[in-house]
């Protein structure tokens, strides 16, 4: 089969599918021209010494196809982002946590900037297996900051899992057979793993083994993680229990520490709600 025979059915199909608008016209060169954008809808192919007229897309049709493709890609990304969010294990209350809604104060302004840099530079962070360790008292915004990073990445279709050590250990109680291996593989399918409340787990051999297994598997897979804890760096660095120190050694090797300070947002919010309710019930 020569080139002309090979192209014949393709050209014929293109001719059948070509839409001719009433405003279209024949140009001086004998080719069909679009009546809207005044660019050719046909061209001449030279095949085996023959000149064959074939349909092509005019400029406005090319732009239309490009828009349709962009719309399709956006819809697919939205669906993928929605699916990734549903698989992220993130509590629904954090789905709306974003850098734009982050309440910036003198206490957290620096950390906000660092978290934004981490999120926008995540391609480099994952290449370097670089994670973060958020330390600080209860209510200082550690989990919220981690959720902001998670949502930034999820919006860009980066797989993220966000859970807590307490939840992990609750599930681990029911692991049978190879369920733990499959669970860890699921954790490691995410580009970023965020685990809340390191140190809130019970100090049993079982609990600490599970915590170590999760962190060590992530470490060995060269995948970044963000951990939050109410422990201080001093407490972690001076841990004398070998069960803890081997966990913390892994963390310090791949996680950059950031301390969160300032008043507890939870206490501030509780005080605001109390005063709001007091005024409602008792009057100003």
Task: Give the positions of each predicted feature.
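Walker B catalytic acidic pair
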Residues: 197-198
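Walker A/P-loop nucleotide-binding motif
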Residues: 124-146
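N-terminal pre-Walker A segment at the start of P-loop NTPase domains
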Residues: 99-125
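Residue-level preference for the first positions of well-ordered beta-strands
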Residues: 129-133, 159-160, 192, 224
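A short, basic N-terminal segment
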Residues: 1-109, 268-284
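A conserved segment at the C-terminal end of the G1
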Residues: 147-151
């Amino acid at each position: 089969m020569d080139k002309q025979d090979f192209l014949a059915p393709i050209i014929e199909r293109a001719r059948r599918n070509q839409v001719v608008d009433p405003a279209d016209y024949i140009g001086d060169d004998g080719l069909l021209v679009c009546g809207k954008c005044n660019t050719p809808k046909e061209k001449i192919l030279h095949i085996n010494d023959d000149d064959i007229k074939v349909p092509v897309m005019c400029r406005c049709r090319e732009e239309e196809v490009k828009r349709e493709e962009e719309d399709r890609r956006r819809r697919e990304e939205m669906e993928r982002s929605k699916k990734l969010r549903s698989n992220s294990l993130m509590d629904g209350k954090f789905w709306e946590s974003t850098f734009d809604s982050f309440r910036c104060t003198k206490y957290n302004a620096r950390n906000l900037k660092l978290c934004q840099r981490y999120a926008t530079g995540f391609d480099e962070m994952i290449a370097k297996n670089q994670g973060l360790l958020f330390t600080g008292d209860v209510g200082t915004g550690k989990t919220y900051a981690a959720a902001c990073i998670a949502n930034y990445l999820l919006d860009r279709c980066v797989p993220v899992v966000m859970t807590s050590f307490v939840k992990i250990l609750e599930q681990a109680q029911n692991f049978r057979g190879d369920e733990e291996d499959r669970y860890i593989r699921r954790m490691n399918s995410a580009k970023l793993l965020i685990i809340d409340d390191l140190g809130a787990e019970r100090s049993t051999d079982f609990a600490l083994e599970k915590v170590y297994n999760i962190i060590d598997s992530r470490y060995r897979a060269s995948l970044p993680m963000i951990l939050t804890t109410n422990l201080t760096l001093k407490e972690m660095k001076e841990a004398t229990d070998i069960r803890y120190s081997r966990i913390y050694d892994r963390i310090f090797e791949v996680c950059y520490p950031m301390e969160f300070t300032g008043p507890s947002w939870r206490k501030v919010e509780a005080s605001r709600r109390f005063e709001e309710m007091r005024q409602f019930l008792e009057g100003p």
